[in-house]
Amino acid sequence: MQIEEKEERILPILFTIIWMLIGYYFLGNILEYAPVVNSIYLGMIATLGITLLITKYWKISLHMAAIGGCFGVFLNLQYIYGGVINYVIFILILSGLLGYSRAILKAHNMQQIYSGFLLGVLMLVSFVSYL
């Protein structure tokens, strides 16, 4: 499935946010997990919410927002706890490859790719930092 028009992305993003909120509620009431997991989950939901708002006007890269969020989490974990620098480097390389593939496929322009990555990084770094 490929969603090329920005208008077609709104409903899938909205459904994803709803399911993540349901999952957050049930997992939070059933399982006890580390506060960092709670922060990551809320950061992902917030990132999706912002991409939903942006998508009404512009086609930001959701792929890059997701991997940017992953990079932001591990970057912050490296800063707080240490010992995950190899993951940080791996995710950064993977991010470059993903961004390159999105550009080659002409799915996004460079602004959309960089903006998506930056949004994901900033959102998840800020949420995980809130620990």
Label the model's feature ranges.
Residues Y24-V37:
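Transmembrane alpha-helix boundary signature
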Residues M1-F15:
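Juxtamembrane helix-capping/reentrant segments at transmembrane boundaries
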Residues L14-Y25:
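A generic, lipid-embedded transmembrane alpha helix
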Residues N38-L131:
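Membrane-embedded catalytic cores of phosphoryl/pyrophosphoryl-handling enzymes
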Residues M1-E4, M20, S39, G43-M44:
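"…centered on the first transmembrane helix and the immediately adjacent amphipathic helix/loop
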